[in-house]
């Protein structure tokens, strides 16, 4: 099941775990989501200009309560910056990632080197002003721990 939204996620009570997982993912990705009601945290994150979210809910895991969730965050920005490194930095700034010590190229994927060691990966589309923030393995582990905690 897919959810696509600009500002909010349409959900009912049985999808609360998805909302919690998305909020946790945003907290991991942006490091700027304040603790509060889950819906408020998600709404705050989605109110960022140009932020769009695709959430895929996979089939339930046999014997477990939670759903595996795949999250893709895509940000469109209108900076008009042509330099790829500047473009990645602009995407990162718009995502609330302010402290970047370096940008490393890995093909179409750019690693944003963070001073705290929690590097971020951005998938860059060189033909447009678009970038996708990818969850790293560490991000996914933190998200998994959160999902187990709320289950």
Model-identified regions with their sequence ranges:
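Ordered hydrophobic segments in well-structured contexts
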Residues: 4-10, 52-54, 68-72, 98-100, ...
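Short, flexible beta-strand-to-coil junctions
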Residues: 12, 74-76, 104-106
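Short, intrinsically disordered low-complexity segments
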Residues: 31-81
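Structural alpha-beta junctions
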Residues: 26-32, 92-101
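A general secondary-structure signal for short beta-strands and their flanking turns/coil
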Residues: 2-4, 64-68, 92
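Short, extreme N-terminal segment that most often corresponds to the first beta-strand
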Residues: 1-30
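Short, hydrophobic/π-rich interface segment
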Residues: 78-99
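Acidic, proline/glycine-rich low-complexity IDRs
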Residues: 89, 97-151
């Amino acid at each position: 099941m897919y959810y696509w939204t600009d500002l909010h996620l349409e959900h009912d009570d049985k999808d609360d775990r998805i909302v919690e997982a998305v909020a946790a993912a945003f907290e991991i990705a942006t490091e700027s989501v304040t603790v509060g009601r889950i819906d408020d945290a998600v709404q705050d994150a989605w109110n960022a200009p140009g932020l769009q979210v695709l959430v895929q809910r996979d089939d339930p895991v046999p014997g477990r309560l939670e759903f595996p969730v795949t999250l893709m965050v895509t940000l469109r920005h209108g900076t008009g910056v042509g330099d790829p490194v500047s473009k990645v930095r602009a995407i990162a700034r718009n995502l609330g990632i302010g402290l970047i010590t370096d940008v490393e190229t890995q093909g179409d994927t750019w690693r944003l080197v963070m001073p705290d060691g929690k590097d971020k990966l951005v998938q860059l589309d060189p033909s447009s002003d678009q970038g996708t923030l990818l969850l790293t393995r560490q991000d996914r582990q933190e998200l998994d721990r959160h999902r187990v905690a709320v289950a």
